[in-house]
Amino acid sequence: MVLPASRNGSVRTWPSDRDLLNSIHQFEIEVTAKDVDRNGHVNNVVYIQWMQDAAVAHALASGCTKTSEAVGATWVVRTHQIEYLSPLFAGDKVTVLTWPANFQRVRSVRKYQFVRAKDGVVVARAETDWVFVNAKTGRPQSIPEEVRNTLPVVTKDLEP
């Protein structure tokens, strides 16, 4: 797994717990010319699309999508928050790390780190607040245990 460089330059270690490692999904991207705006770097809206793509890929890979559909539900975005730390440019390769940070009754926070491949620098951090809703009515509904179990939570002390 690609891990960002630590802030103080120390060696990063990672737990060997299989569930934890499976909870952090990696989504690889190569920045294209169409991702770049007039300022010459990746446009802020592109990060949101990458967040959506990474979350969907993780939900599909973990079985969350299938399990949610089986109970007649889906996920919708409530809010996004992004902190931009360093720009990305056409040709850059970036790994989006994403994981569930918590589950509440009808909501879940998913976190993201954007790590530039060539130097391991975290170029952005983000969060999405997702709401679990009934697919027919669009109304929030409680997240059942079988859905929660598809995506084990990564606690703050174990985040990359």
Language model regions located:
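Terminal targeting signals and extreme-terminal segments of soluble enzymes
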Residues: 2-95, 101-160
